[in-house]
């Protein structure tokens, strides 16, 4: 009831000068059918499907492709198929993307995985994040141009990066300079979720100590990772996200191999000590990462991308002197006043 009153007050305040009256659901004379809008939205979404674009960044050998395949229980990584986008932006870092349509229980998702082979693999990794920053901002620019088109598409194709999963090697020490510099720069333009790769190489105590040191380094360097406190919309969401923030970075293990454990088939890695069950939270935090990216926060990642990161870029671009937004025809996909 308190929440309903707050919503009514907010609505009244958002419409100054207009008289508003409310009839609560309990005061209605009969069934109206307002809740049916949820079914309408569900049917529309199931028919159209939706897009989700995830970037994976980290040095070679950390199991990026394997983890992505494990997340979506299918061969969706760059190594599993030919890329539909490939660009060598520098001598060291290349970007590849592959797209798949995944369907589950009638819901279709166009999943695009952007990989960054070559990142952090050189002796001199100076400015190795620049090609990635360039790619992320190029997708914002592409979306912005489509928005400004006079005869724009009913549904603008969305290639913006909704999430960047950053892989940290399980050193057990602290963040490296390259980790700090990358997350400081990318955290301003995209939602970053850091993970400790191949966490089975650490003991449980080593893992917890490493996670704590990483959180200290993130705070000391002003690095913002998803989900950010400032974007929490209500107390309930704040409590949920606080638990996630206390668990970051997730210590993960990826595999596409199944093993028999107590008569059940489980995804896991076989070691001389036994089977490490990927989806067993007592063994690693893969399930927590999966729940965050897919089951609980996927739509929020898309919303933060559109309402925060893209909006910041859009406002900056429209305020730049080389934009003139006077009415006019579009030529070659750009407004006639575009000088960029």
List the predicted regions and their residue ranges.
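Intrinsically disordered, low-complexity regulatory regions enriched in Ser/Pro/Gly/Thr
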Residues: 45-50, 59-61, 94, 103-108, ...
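Active-site phosphate-binding and catalytic loops of NTP-dependent enzymes
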Residues: 78-81, 141-148, 225-227
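Residues immediately flanking
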Residues: 59, 116, 170, 198, ...
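Conserved G1/Walker A P-loop phosphate-binding module
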Residues: 1-139, 280, 290-294, 337-338
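Conserved Switch II/interswitch segment of TRAFAC-class P-loop GTPases
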Residues: 28, 119-125, 133-177, 193-194, ...
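Alpha-helical scaffold elements adjacent to nucleotide-binding pockets in ATP/GTP-utilizing enzyme cores
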Residues: 67-71, 128-131, 135, 182-185, ...
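Conserved GTP-binding G-domain of TRAFAC-class P-loop NTPases and closely related GTPase folds
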Residues: 160, 177-178, 188-340
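Extended hydrophobic secondary-structure segments that form protein cores and membrane-embedded regions
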Residues: 55-56, 112-115, 162-167, 249-252
């Amino acid at each position: 009831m308190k929440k309903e009153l707050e919503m009514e007050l907010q609505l009244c305040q958002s419409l100054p000068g207009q008289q508003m009256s409310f009839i609560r659901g309990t005061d209605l004379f009969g069934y109206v059918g307002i809740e049916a809008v949820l079914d309408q939205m569900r049917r529309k979404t199931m028919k159209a499907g939706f897009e989700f674009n995830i970037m994976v960044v980290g040095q070679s050998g950390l199991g990026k492709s394997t983890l992505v395949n494990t997340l979506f229980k299918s061969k969706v990584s760059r190594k599993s198929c030919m890329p539909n986008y490939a660009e060598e932006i520098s001598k060291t870092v290349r970007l590849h993307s592959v797209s798949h349509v995944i369907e589950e229980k009638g819901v279709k998702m166009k999943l695009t995985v952007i990989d960054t082979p070559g990142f952090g693999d050189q002796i001199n990794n100076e400015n190795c994040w620049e090609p990635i920053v360039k790619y992320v901002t190029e997708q914002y620019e592409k979306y912005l141009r489509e928005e400004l088109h006079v005869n724009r598409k009913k549904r603008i194709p969305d290639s913006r990066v909704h999430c960047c999963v950053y892989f940290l090697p399980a050193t057990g020490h602290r963040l490296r300079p390259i980790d700090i510099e990358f997350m400081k720069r990318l955290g301003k333009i995209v939602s970053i979720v850091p993970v400790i790769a191949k966490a089975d190489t650490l003991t449980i105590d080593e893992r917890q100590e490493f996670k704590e040191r990483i959180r200290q380094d993130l705070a000391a360097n002003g690095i913002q990772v998803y989900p950010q406190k400032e974007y929490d919309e209500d107390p309930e969401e704040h409590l949920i996200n606080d638990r996630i923030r206390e668990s970051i970075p997730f210590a993960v293990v990826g595999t596409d191999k199944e093993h028999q454990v107590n008569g059940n088939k489980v995804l896991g890695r076989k070691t001389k000590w036994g089977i490490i069950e990927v989806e067993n939270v007592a063994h690693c935090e893969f399930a927590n990462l999966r729940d965050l990216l897919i089951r609980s926060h996927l739509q929020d990642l898309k919303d933060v991308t559109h309402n925060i990161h893209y909006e910041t870029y859009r406002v900056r671009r429209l305020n730049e002197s080389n934009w003139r937004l006077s009415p006019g025809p579009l030529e070659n996909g750009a407004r006639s006043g575009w000088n960029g």
